[in-house]
């Protein structure tokens, strides 16, 4: 799998993620004869080959630069072409933890979509695990099939993923009774697919499920379906992830604030005088008199400016954060552009048959 192997340098044929800005990452297929163009200029692929991943690469015009990063599921989530709404990394991390997806886990995913979750699961379960993912939309299925083959995720190219074009709500899941350890449903009506899972849950150990739904009404329907079919430990979680940045804020004293107000007032008065002078010049019909008046007024203006500039002007130069010549205090600021919550997460557990029978006999 492309996303599970790591190397130091860019090679011809690689899939890379180009970092153009904080919120702008795009996938690039490195081909020696191609050139990538953006607002900073041209970036020939031939000059990228041999560079280290993470190295700064300047445009031919030296007007800007990009970074080439080796793709990971986390970076791919930020760079992938959106075919549907996607699952972001904060939700993916919690789903992995609650479903206990680890190396060697067998997972069913219904609703491949843009395959953000598929890439993360495939990387986690490794070569000993299996991902059975289903997509009912024909066009999205074909796009995902090509993408998975290029990323070496499919079973027929040495990967661990089975991709199937199927409407699981109507036709169920696999034709064979494959047992899985975890189930992830990203469907408009997951409660219609839940009854079809009975042939695929383990009877000798627990099987865990997550339903990913944007509306609380969908969660209610899914919870009722799970409860009726004997699933337990049903809970809903909403991930409200925030990233806080530690910064320093300059302490401004009252004297400095007063000086700044005086400076603003002085500039406003000067601007008024200049506008007044231009109006008088426009009204003058005698050019010679106009010039004389202009000279005298400029002289008066200069004298007034020299008098008022006796006040210490407030500097407009940029002050570097943490400059030792100023006083600073530590503050924190939340990143408002962070992509996290998109839906509610409904979790449940299906107990092994023997343990479930014991629980029913003993009662609550």
From Swiss-Prot:
Main location: nucleus
Enzyme Commission numbers on file: 2.1.1.220
GO terms, biological process: tRNA methylation
Molecular-function GO terms, alphabetical: tRNA (adenine(58)-N1)-methyltransferase activity
GO cellular component, one term: cytosol
Sequence positions that bind S-adenosyl-L-methionine: 114-116, 135, 140, 167-168, 186
Localization, UniProt: Nucleus
PROSITE patterns noted in UniProt: SAM_TRM61
Main function: Catalytic subunit of tRNA (adenine-N(1)-)-methyltransferase, which catalyzes the formation of N(1)-methyladenine at position 58 (m1A58) in initiator methionyl-tRNA.
PANTHER family: TRNA (ADENINE(58)-N(1))-METHYLTRANSFERASE (PTHR12133), TRNA (ADENINE(58)-N(1))-METHYLTRANSFERASE CATALYTIC SUBUNIT TRMT61A (PTHR12133:SF2)
Protein name: tRNA (adenine(58)-N(1))-methyltransferase catalytic subunit trm61
Gene expressing this chain: cpd1
